[in-house]
């Protein structure tokens, strides 16, 4: 659950920073009328993720783009070295970007500016737009809560979607491993119980069904100093046969 908790914490931190940056740098607010509305949000393979849409709109699309990038950079800087080590693989899987821990911020900035300033995005004048994400996983018993922040512009929403693709890709990498890890732990516990039960039955059988002579031998074998007469007494417990002298004479 620790990994799932860290993902959720990162998602929450990222959303808070995006809202704050949009408000500070792009004069966005929840009360501003949005030129673009989110019609539908599709997750093709949803395995335990919840989604809400929040409006933080403004008229300055370029400032929105810069605000989103600034929030992403600050959030990445706050990750632990272990968390940062996973990020390049997430970029490759989600955005097909080849990057490294040291260049990930610059590479993401270049990707967003090139993609979100393209004519396909800028010329999109649809007032109601749909957002499609491939897949998202929640940890067992703990759904991942996502927040898509609608900036009110195609540019800003393009950058938000890029970040959403990264965070959902992180859930697909970690949550299934947690499920698999839980299964391995379960089987290891079962195997351990079986081994202990077998050992118990073995010793119980030795103690309950071993002959009296064998029990005495086992007990004596565990003693450090045993007088030889004790062994004699043990091995000759059966009374000797008495042969009459008359029989021998006959």
Curated annotation (Swiss-Prot):
Question: Which Gene Ontology terms of cellular component type are present?
Answer: membrane; viral envelope; virion membrane
The protein's matches in Pfam families, at most eight in alphabetical order, are given as: L1R_F9L
Q: Give the start-end ranges of region Targeting to MV membrane.
A: 2-12
- Transmembrane segments annotated in the record for this chain: 184-204
- Enumerate the UniProt keywords alphabetically: Disulfide bond, Host-virus interaction, Late protein, Lipoprotein, Membrane, Myristate, Transmembrane, Transmembrane helix, Viral attachment to host cell, Viral envelope protein, Viral penetration into host cytoplasm, Virion, Virus entry into host cell
Post-translational modification (record): Myristoylated. Disulfid bonds are oxidized in the cytoplasm by OPG088 protein.
Report the superkingdom from the record: Viruses
Result of changing residue 136 to S: 70% loss in virus production
Taken from the UniProt record, the cysteine pairs bridged by disulfide bonds within this chain are 34-57, 49-136, 116-158
Asked whether the UniProt record includes Transmembrane helix among its keywords, one would answer: yes
Q: Where is the lipid attached (N-myristoyl glycine)?
A: 2
Q: Which residues lie on this side of the membrane: Intravirion?
A: 205-250
**Record's bilayer topology term:** Single-pass membrane protein
Matching entries from InterPro entries are given as:
Virion_mem_poxvirus_L1 (IPR003472)
Which residues point to the Virion surface side?
Answer: 2-183
- What induces this protein's gene, according to its Swiss-Prot or TrEMBL record? Expressed in the late phase of the viral replicative cycle.
The answer to whether keyword Acetylation applies is no
- Tell me the subunit arrangement: Component of the entry fusion complex (EFC) composed of OPG053/F9, OPG076/O3, OPG086/G3, OPG094/G9, OPG095/L1, OPG099/L5, OPG107/H2, OPG143/A16, OPG104/J5, OPG147/A21 and OPG155/A28. Except for OPG095/L1 and OPG053/F9, each of the EFC proteins is required for assembly or stability of the complex.
Q: Which family does it belong to?
A: Belongs to the orthopoxvirus OPG095 family.
What is its biological role?
Component of the entry fusion complex (EFC), which consists of 11 proteins. During cell infection, this complex mediates entry of the virion core into the host cytoplasm by a two-step mechanism consisting of lipid mixing of the viral and cellular membranes and subsequent pore formation.
What this protein is called in its record is: Entry-fusion complex associated protein OPG095
> Gene encoding this chain?
OPG099
